[in-house]
Amino acid sequence: MHAEFRTDRGRIRHHNEDNGGVFENKDNQPIVIVADGMGGHRAGDVASEMAVRLLSDAWKETTALLTAEEIETWLQKTIQEVNKEIVLYSESEMDLNGMGTTLVAAIMAQSQVVIANVGDSRGYLLQNHVLRQLTEDHSLVHELLRTGEISKEDAMNHPRKNILLRALGVEGKVEVDTFVVPFQTSDTLLLCSDGLTNMVPETEMEEILKSKRTLSEKADVFITKANSYGGEDNITVLLVERDLTQKGRDAS
């Protein structure tokens, strides 16, 4: 597996409240994670850092999970535990009350990948030269779009675009979506925060992923492109291919 992680403050925000990285368990099986924090006074930074640290620390203590079913069970259970820890910590510190974070994570299982998500950080897969979104945004605007109350054009500039219906750290229990999809040698997995998807159209994202650039160059281009369109939020990108082997690493 070859992975490239990038995170950038963007052109407007003073702090980077995104977090993420690539982490391995005891059998060198990787998990890839992106989290986008929310809350004032750097609380979002605390929430996203906690989510990534707690989930990756739990993963580092496991041995290889070989089936998609095992991985789904582990993700559901562990993300609930992570959520409870964030809630408890936010309740213990006045400055952190109301903090929360999105989360999207992926674990490889033989010829498949298992993805878990909460919030509006997304997972995409480029397969057979076609980019498709795997995750569903847990946001007010997505719900209005899904029910036909607004158009796709309305959604792009909706005043309540940042309202989430699900996030880690908000309530004692959180609903986690999980997906199992085929992941072949020629495929590319993209995990990202909304600082990318709110800035760069999916048609351009697809063209970048289909290009002849290296995976590292593609990750850099995503950051540059989002900033060139305004860089209104923190931008985080994690790209994964399975045809190369690279030692896992973490970043924040």
UniProtKB/Swiss-Prot annotation:
The keyword Cell inner membrane does not apply. It catalyses: O-phospho-L-seryl-[protein] + H2O = L-seryl-[protein] + phosphate; O-phospho-L-threonyl-[protein] + H2O = L-threonyl-[protein] + phosphate. Its main location: cytoplasm. SMART domains: PP2C_SIG (SM00331), PP2Cc (SM00332). Residues 1-18 have a biased composition (Basic and acidic residues). Coiled coil: none annotated. The keyword Cell inner membrane does not apply. Gene3D superfamilies: PPM-type phosphatase domain. It is found in: Cytoplasm; Membrane. It holds the Pfam family PP2C_2. Binds 2 manganese ions per subunit. One of its GO terms (cellular component) is cytoplasm. It is a peripheral membrane protein. Mn(2+) 2 binds at residues 36, 194, 233. CDD domains: PP2Cc. Residues 1-23 are annotated as: Disordered. GO terms for molecular function: metal ion binding; protein serine/threonine phosphatase activity. Its cofactor is Mn(2+). Protein phosphatase that dephosphorylates EF-Tu. Belongs to the PP2C family. This is Serine/threonine phosphatase stp. The gene is stp.
